[in-house]
Amino acid sequence: MNNETKFTPLNIDNVMAEKGMLERVRAIVEYGIKHNLTAREVRDIINREMNRLETVVALQNETAREEYIRRRLGLSDQDIVTDAHVFEAFEIRQHLGLTN
């Protein structure tokens, strides 16, 4: 496959590392200690920040996947993408041995 039709989803662990999430977690814990937050409050802050980043990555991956399908099959933004299009774009049937 050439670069125009390649689909490589973002890896959440790599994105979190690039964003310095462990350092951010440390800063949140230090903030919690300094401001007498409960462990639950600190955990909620950490979870909220991680969930926000996971949501962003999931949306970017979904958008990239849709763009890949449209490019691969020559569909416009106005075309409706069906399950058959998804199967065709990712060649799922071929990988499952369902085609000749």
From Swiss-Prot:
The name of this protein is Uncharacterized protein gp14
> What is the induction note for this entry?
Expressed in the early phase of the viral replicative cycle. Expression of early genes is repressed by viral Repc (latency) and favored by viral Ner protein.
Q: Which family would the database say this protein is a member of?
A: Belongs to the mulikevirus gp14 protein family.
Q: Which GO terms describe its cellular component?
A: host cell cytoplasm
Query: What domain of life does the native source organism fall in?
Result: Viruses
Taxonomy of origin reads: Viruses, Duplodnaviria, Heunggongvirae, Uroviricota, Caudoviricetes
* Primary localisation category: host cell
Q: Which UniProt keywords apply?
A: Early protein, Host cytoplasm
Subcellular localization is given as: Host cytoplasm
